[in-house]
Amino acid sequence: MLKCKICEKSGIFEKFDEDVIKCKKCNSMYYTGSQNKEIPRVVSVTSNLKSSAQKKNSQLIARSYLQYLKKKANIDFENALDIGCGFGDFVEELNKIGINAGGIESDEDTVKNAKSHVSHGFFDELYDSTIKYDFISVNQTLYYFEDSFVILKKISDLLKPNGIVMIATVNTESSFRQEHKIWTQGCKICFGNEVWKSFDKFGLKCIDITSYDDNLFIDFFLNKSNMMSKSQFLKNLVFYVSKIKKLFVYKDNGINNFILLKKF
């Protein structure tokens, strides 16, 4: 009988889609297909227009990340590392407020188009542990790793005492995701909400879980699913860029979660 890789309970699964199952005990979800899909690139190598839109989106998201962090944590960090940093916009936002921040990104094409302080590389249990950090972020990235537990343990090893980990990730308990069967391409595993509260073994304590809707992601999905016109999608995009509408909206049962973990 199949056992959940997260809570280790048996026989408690429900099918989410063709290749994804959900544990009814811990609400974690994971891909079960024989060959996972390629992790999507951040940067488009085929369209300058698409790349420009991606960069603008990245800037909007980075500012929203910083707004959340300022709201929930004391950000007097000396240094920071952003894992899977994409174009490096969140890294840049951190540097603007006096934090010595750097980022690591695995896709070479993205790094070529990235801001300064971004280096090409891969994060795993062998990542250099010489430097210790006050703050580490891994946003919309943790679910791409084969073993998220190994990655969290490594992150804990890299943190200074009382250091903070910020994670933006999928909310597996979102009714919108459940209704529309939304699974992120390349995703391996997503933890249920209660799982985030059980990382004492890594020296990490959960200090916040905040659910939110990424409205641009929702609009993009609705447009691709022919539930929103292209003109309305583009109009909303202008509203987000001009700050007439909020990109991120905090709400119960949002499609994503912010997680804050503290090293003890």
Language model features with spans:
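Short conserved AdoMet
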Residues: K115, E146, K160
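Conserved N-terminal segment of class I S-adenosyl-L-methionine
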Residues: M1-I131, F135-N139, F149-L152, D252-F258
